[in-house]
Amino acid sequence: MKIRFATIKDAPELLKIYEQYIDTPITFEEKIPSLYEYEQRIDNIIRRYPYLVCKSNNVIIGYAYAHRQMERDAYQWNAELSVYLLPDYTSRGFGKILYSILIDILKLQGIKNVYGGVTLPNEKSEKLHYALGFNKLGIYRNTGYKCGKWHDVIWFEKKISEYDPTPKRIKPINVINNEAIISVSYTHLRAHETLMN
């Protein structure tokens, strides 16, 4: 298994993974984005936030990324997380390791809180968030209509850093020390390998 930062060249493989969720309520998007549109999305995220891909046997099996939780400047110390895996690789610890590495990189950037939204029911994703120490914030009732029915979305929150009285602005991902990122990734990968053996 290898985890690295995503590039725009990964877009075709990432889009193929995402396509598998289009006909489900896991994403509220109803049409598959074009390859160009997906490339633009990746490009917009990697300018500021971590976007990770997980490879096994030289194939991308999943990806996870962080993005701005809300647009107003005072919200800049928050990030929302997303993770998508090929169906055969769910419930095997890959989502947990991707989320864990994302969170530790976000700490280096100065992020204070991370959030995750999960369309209900989704027991696997709920378990993932609780296992990583997220707290349930609340439920948006009947907030999305897809696949012929209304869906609730549960929101999770996790504090990942202390609240400074005068916080510094968030550091873009490209200014974070590479050695620190490698150290974070290595620690989580070793822990995952130990659990799998």
Which role does the model predict for each range below?
Residues L120-G138:
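Conserved active-site alpha-helix within GNAT-family acetyltransferase domains
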Residues N142-S185:
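C-terminal "cap" of GNAT-fold acetyltransferases
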Residues K107-V118:
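Conserved GNAT acetyl-CoA-binding A-motif
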Residues S91-D104, K127, A131:
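Conserved acetyl-CoA-binding loop-helix of GNAT-fold acetyltransferases
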Residues K2-K16:
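A short beta-loop-alpha structural element at the N-terminal edge
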Residues T187-T194:
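Conserved small/polar residues in nucleotide/adenosyl-binding loops
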Residues K16-I32:
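Helix-loop element at the rim of GNAT/NAT acetyltransferase active sites that forms part
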Residues E30-D88, Y99-S100, K159-I160:
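Acetyl-CoA-dependent GNAT
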